[in-house]
Swiss-Prot record:
Residues 1-16, 24-60 have a biased composition (Acidic residues). GO terms for cellular component: condensin complex; cytoplasm; nucleus. GO terms for biological process: cell division; chromosome segregation; mitotic chromosome condensation; mitotic sister chromatid segregation. InterPro entries: P-loop_NTPase, RecF/RecN/SMC_N, SMC_hinge, SMC_hinge_sf. Residues 71-80, 100-150, 1386-1415 have a biased composition (Low complexity). Central component of the condensin complex, a complex required for conversion of interphase chromatin into mitotic-like condense chromosomes. The condensin complex probably introduces positive supercoils into relaxed DNA in the presence of type I topoisomerases and converts nicked DNA into positive knotted forms in the presence of type II topoisomerases. Residues 361-479, 533-675, 855-1120, 1162-1233 form a coiled coil. This is Structural maintenance of chromosomes protein 4. It comes from Dictyostelium discoideum. Keywords: ATP-binding, Cell cycle, Cell division, Coiled coil, DNA condensation, Mitosis, Nucleotide-binding, Nucleus. It comes from the Eukaryota. One of its GO terms (molecular function) is ATP binding.
Amino acid sequence: MVEDEEINDQISEEEEEKKKNNDSDEEMKDIDEEEEEEEEEEEEEEEEEKEEEEEEEEEETPKKPMPPPQSKAKPSSQPPDIKKASQQSQTQKNTPPPIQTSQSSQSSQSSQSSQQQQPKNISQTQQPKNTPPLQSSQTSQTSQKTPVSSNNGIEKRLMITKMVMENFKSYAGAQEVGPFHKCFSSVVGPNGSGKSNVIDAMLFVFGYRAKQIRLNKISELIHNSENHKNLTNGRVSVHFQEIIDLPGEDNYEVVKGSEFVVTRTAQKTGNNKDGVSKYYLNDKVVKLDDLKTILKDKGIDLDNNRFLILQGEVEQIAMMKPKGVHPGEEGLLEYLEDIIGSKKYLPDIEATSKLIEDIGDKRTSSNNRMKVVEKEKDALQQERDNALEYIDKELKLIHCKSIHYQIGRSKPEREKNEIAAKQEMVEKQLEQELVTQKASNDKLLEFEKNLKQQNKQLDELNKQMAKCKNELLTTEKKGVKYKEETKHLKTKVKKNNSVIEEETKKQAEFERSTIIHKQDIVRFEKEYVELPKELIVEEKKLESMLNSLKGEVTELQREMEEKQKQLLPWSKKHSEAKAVVDLKTSELAVLSKDFNGATQNLDDAIKALEDAKTISSTRKNNITKSKKELESVKAIIVDLEKRLASGKVTEENLYRNTMDAKRQLEQIKTNLSENSSRNTILDRLLKIKESGQISGIHGRLGDLGAIDQKYDVAISTAAFSQMDNIIVETTAAAEACVELLRKENLGRATFMILENLEYQRQNLGPVQTPNNTPRLFDLIKMKDEKKYATAFFTAVGHTLVADTLDEATKIAYGAKRHRVVTLDGSLIDTSGAMSGGGLKPRVGAMNSKLKGDPKEDKKKLIELQDNLSQLDSDLRQCRDELVEIENQIQQAQNRRSELELELPKMDMDIKAAITKCEELTKVIPQLKNKAKLSTEKKEQIDSIKESLIVDQKSLDKVQEKVNKLESEVQEIQNSILNVGGPQLKMQKNKVESLQSRIDSNQTNTTKANVQIKSLAKSMEKSIKILNENTKEKDENEAALAEILEKYKSLEKENLKATEAMEAVSEQLREKEEETKEIRKEHEKAKKVIEKIKVSNSKLETQIEEFKTLINEKQAEIADCLSKFANQAKKAKIYKDYVDESLINQVSAILTPEEIEQYMEATEQQNLIAKIHELTTQIQKISKENNVNIEVVKDFQKKEQEYHSRKAEFDEIEKERDNLSKRYESLRKNRLDEFMAGFTIITMKLKEIYQMITLGGDAELEIIDREDPFQEGISFSVRPPKKSWKNISNLSGGEKTLSSLALVFALHHYKPNALYVMDEIDAALDFKNVSIIANYIKERTKNAQFIIISLRNYMFELADRLVGIYKTDNCTKSVTINPNSFTSLSTTTTTTNNSQQQQQQKQQQKQQQQNSTSQK
């Protein structure tokens, strides 16, 4: 009720209507309450049955957990109605959610509930019992479109399954609307949510412009909201399918393969601010016209879209005028006639009416012209009779002359036949030669084809060779790189091995020396222990010996002891000084060795670094130069290749020009040969003219004019022999020339006498030709047009020139026959005979410029010979240059390959040098550090040297003192020894020897310990060097192994590339040999063809000579025939004045037998005498009477014009009668067809209006009963309990009902598969809304209705509810199957009733308690 009141406020109805609506609402409430009570009982029974079925299903399938109830504080994103339904559904544990239920699950429920949900007021309407359902409308109307039927007779129809909107208007993203029901779907939702955008989306898909959808530009249709800004495209897709209805509300069968999708897109572009749009059918782009045609075949007419009723349009249907006032305006008459189909006759009726008016005017005009011509004809009768007598004499003279000229052609005709027989023999020989030439040409073409194919294959092989070379070059570059890396690594490994070997030897030597020194120390220590003992023994012996000589040597011993006491401290000092000097000498030797090695290594590294930098710099300079040279070589190759390609084109052009020059030369030679005899006669006659013997000779006809080179073949074909005619002024001059030729036996010639050709001057004026085709005569440029025009016209006549044979055929075989020649030499005569198409067309009959020198052809021949010689020379020179260029290209390519190989090598050298520099740069600081340490050692060495010098000086001083004391002791000892004899000396030597050995052992032990320490340090250094080199060697060997593995793989690739290149090279060599052989054969074939051409040229020359002779004989015959033809032409002058059979008789061609009759001299004399007699009579008649033969022609014209006018008048009369009959027939067919459909629609309108208004009446009435199409159709209705009213006087709701009744009646007459309506119930009260909804529900099963409505009485009866709601300024959709809520509503009602009963009981108890307390 709230929604009804809001709608009534919006449409602003009158207060009385509002009261009626409120009363009717209350009545509907009562009816609804009664219906609910009955339905509750039925639903309880159904609920019990459903619960049993659900329990059985639950045993088979697990129960789905229901979602928890929503909190009241949390706002719902669903529209209000949907939210209520979802809350109710949560109260039923075993009821599945109803949103978007499948059609298959609803089929059984919808069929059971469809009858139970029908309101009672619908069953109580005044509907006739025998009214057939809407889908059983008459199909006998020929103009009615019925649903498409399948092969077995079952009707199928189109339906919309769903719509998908993406970024369209209020729909953001891809939003699916549907699925729609096959019959009745309703779109519901609050105002502003985007319901009407559903219809706007359909209008958009069906081709409506943006302004028709309430916007200005296509780009404005794209969605734009706060959360979805700057979208660039939108689209709408409508999904269709064809179905076959099955029993049950939801049951149908989809026609296999009938599904299709229609899509339209809108897109913003940078260049087009308005946006662009495209149409798609099944994702394929289509044009709108094609889409309209496809949908029209499916039953959707987008041009006359009666299936779309927009918001506010429903009232406009009934408000249409009876008839459109202005052209293109649609009234009710046009609306109905468009649906009935009788509108198809209207264009023919209007066109026929216009034709009848026009032909009436033509009839009156034709009758007047016929009467005028009849009067003019009668006035010329007498003059016509006088002219016919003159014409009779003239025709008899023509007849005699015709016989005379036919007799004169007999002799040359026989001679011509003999020459023709010889010509035929030569032509047969030429034909055989041509066959041979054709075979040779075919063979040459085959060679050329093979040569072209070979060249193509050679190019392909050359490409393969270049590819192989590039691959090989790549592998070679890699190989050079790997070789350099291998070489570098091997050098490093070799160096490592050398160092390792050296250090290993050093370590072995160190170990051996250490062992020896240790052994020496052990031996020295052992001797050091044993020798003193032995010394004591020997000293005791010596002492004993001395004691025995004590008396003799006492003084000497005392002196010696004194000296030895002096010597003892000095000996100790000497030993100490000597030990210090020896130790410092050993340390000095070790330190000097390390210092010299470090310095030498640093110097070597610095020198190697300088060398590496020098190599890198040198290689960089070389690589820069090589790269520049490589780029230069590549540029040279490109330039040479361009020159080679250009040279080949030049060579081909020169070869073609050479061949063309040769052909032109042969042609001119042939022409000169053909014209030799002709030029001889002409030269002789011109000399006679110059000498003054014969006057009036003008020359050869072809030399007296010129024609564009384009028309040379045409003029030569059409009038070759005529162009050789010699033009003379008078008959006397012609006879003199003939006599000269006979005397000098120069041959034959044909002469044209200008004074006898004056009659042709009347034909020189311009004439109208088909398609303005030029006359050959008009294309000739003459030396003196006034003088020679008649001669040229006699030669070519009205011959026309066409570009092609097809054009010539159309002109020649038209309504009037024409003589036509084509540019390529085909000729069609007026008789229909066609000639042409030979090997070579005729040329040279006339020059392109006016001829001044008769020797022009010879000069041209010399020019062509010189040109040909120059071309041959240029061709040879060009070929030599091409060979030279190819050699240069090969040299440049070789140099390029060398440079491409050198560059990687130099690059590797640079990389190796850079690597070495980097290594040395790292090593040198280390060596410098070592050298720095050595410098410290050097200072230590210097210090040791200085100290050693001091110590050595001290040692020398001590040594000097010791030596002196030892010398003195030695002298004393010698003295003692001399006293003691040899034994004492020996013992003394023995003691000294032992003492010396003891001293030596002490010194050697010190040296050995110093050497062992030095060797230990050297061993540590050697081990470190050995470890470093061993590690470096392992790394280098691993890198070397990897490089070698890569190199092996590269060698395989290189081998493959080499083998591939060798294979391609072999193929290339073989292909070049094949090409060489084919070229040889090609040249041979060319030479054979040239020989054949020379032979053919001779035969053609011979044939042309025969033709020339034949032409001469033909010229004689033609002269006679020309004179005979002239007589025929003269006779044809009178063809417009006398009967045509008489003209044919006087110019008839005689048979050979008839000619033989006139061959006798007597017959010829009689014929000549008769000619003179008739000539005299004609001259006499001309002088005596002023005869005007044109009167005969004028009379004939008037007579013909009279008959023509009479026939024209009769034809117009007949045509007028036929048009009148057709006009009446078309009007009758239109009226009959319209009235048949109109009657059905009117009856159905009355029936439907009575039903939906419960007693009202409606009628479509023809305003003019005589002619329904004159004033149109009026629509009158009588609402229930009211009088008849015009539509304009009805209320909004009554207008809506009237329009809907008319729409339903039209649907009955011509069903549409689809109807889309936007708020058609806006102006209706709830009662009428319910009636309309029930009508759509029950009576339109054969169509799909999609209705946008806010009225619950409408959408509650829908088979499918499509909810539209908006959140965040974005429209969304949800689809509900109402039938799935049947059980839900029953359970809810039962629960509510039990709750109410409990509440009533509690209230009663409370009242009883209150009453008790009061008491």
